[in-house]
Each structure stands twice: as C-alpha cells, then as structure tokens.
C-alpha cells in the first residue's frame, strides 16, 4: 500500500474517474480471490488467468470498439511520464499484437504513451514515490477548496473525501473511506479512519475509528 491504500484500489478508482468502464486484470489465477477485496464493488472487472492471458484477452477484446488502455505492472497515478508502462491503442490493433505474440510483447500500431503515471517495481521505489503521492492528493483537495496548513506533515489516503472550506491542521492522518464534510476544522494531530464527519465539525487531537461525528 501507499498512504494506507492498496495500489490496485487507487489505480482502479483513479481510472474509473477518468472514464474507464471495464477492467481486465491479468494475474496468477491463484491470486484472483486475494485481489477481489481491493477492487471497488462497482467496478466492472474480469479476472484473466496469467498463464492463458493471450487467448483470454483476445476473446475479450475481439468485439471491443475504440481505445484500450494497457497498464503493465504496478503503477501509481502520479508523475509526468509513464516510460511506456501505460499506453493506449485501438482495440483492433491490440488484437493483432495478441494474435502475433500471444501477449503484449510489442506496442500496437498507433499506440500512445500515457502521461501521469509512475511505475514502481519494489519497496524502495514505493517509498521514494510517497512524497509525490502526498503532493498529488493535497493538490486535488486544494483544487476542491480545502485548506491544508502543512502538506508535509499531513497524510491523506487517496480514498478520503473532504468538503470545501475545511481546514486540515498539521499532524493529521486521514485513512480509508473517511468522508469529511464542509467547513470543518480537523486537527492538529487527529487520526481519523473510516469515519463520516458532518459539516462544520471540529475534531481536535483525537483518534476516531469507524464512527460518525457531527
């Protein structure tokens, strides 16, 4: 996980927000059951057996129209350039590659490299990416009218929702599916996990778990 959130969860929710409607997740068949809890319930997902992914993906994509987004490996929705780990191509061109190689071993014709993603191959790269992720999340909340007094001393899970006019004070940790209302003051030194905090509520130096406040 990064900032308390599994990478798979963050990526699926981010891509759904960008308009991706259907997901084909390729992995070892034995891992499918382990992955399901980390995928949003409202996501349209097909799990593909990694050992037979070429033929299975070909069967799934043959009737698809339009563009397909390919994500290779663990990737975070931050950064400037994906280095080719994330790219889009026409479904028909994707099928041609699968027929020829049995996998996405080459870029489909007309493929476009997608920006705004960061591949992470190991724990060290994941740790290095944390500051960038924290900044991206803070910027999203800034744009929505939230004030974060010290972004370098505030940790917000990407799943958290915060209403406009709310002020987040230093030392605050917001985790899980927490929802903070409008015009609240949170912190300093508050830890809130999987809670709903109503509008115009103040939470000061408290630890809240799975609760509704305000």
Task: Label the predicted regions.
Residues 1-48:
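N-terminal glycine-rich phosphate-binding loop and ensuing alpha1 helix
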Residues 19-21, 64, 207:
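Short loop/turn motifs at secondary-structure junctions
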Residues 75, 108-110, 114-214:
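Left-handed beta-helix
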Residues 83-118, 125, 129:
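A glycine-centered loop/beta-turn motif at secondary-structure junctions
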């Amino acid at each position: 996980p990064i900032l308390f959130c599994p990478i798979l969860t963050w990526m699926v929710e981010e891509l759904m927000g960008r308009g991706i409607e259907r997901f084909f997740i390729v992995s070892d068949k034995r891992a499918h059951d382990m992955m399901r809890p980390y995928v949003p319930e409202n996501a349209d997902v097909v799990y593909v057996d990694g050992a037979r992914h070429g033929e299975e993906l070909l069967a799934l994509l043959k009737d698809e129209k339009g563009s397909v987004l390919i994500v290779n490996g663990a990737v975070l929705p931050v950064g400037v350039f994906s280095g080719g780990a994330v790219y889009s191509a026409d479904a028909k061109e994707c099928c041609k590659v699968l027929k020829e190689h049995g996998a996405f071993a080459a870029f489909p014709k007309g493929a476009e490299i997608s920006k705004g993603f960061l591949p992470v191959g190991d724990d060290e790269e994941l740790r290095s990416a944390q500051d960038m992720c924290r900044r991206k999340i803070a910027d999203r909340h800034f744009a929505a009218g939230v004030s974060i007094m010290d972004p370098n001393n505030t940790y917000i899970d990407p799943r958290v929702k915060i209403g406009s006019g709310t002020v987040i004070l230093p030392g605050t940790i917001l985790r899980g599916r927490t929802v903070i209302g409008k015009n609240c003051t949170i912190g300093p030194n508050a830890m809130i996990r999987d809670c709903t905090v109503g509008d115009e509520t103040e939470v000061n130096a408290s630890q809240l778990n799975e609760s509704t406040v305000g």
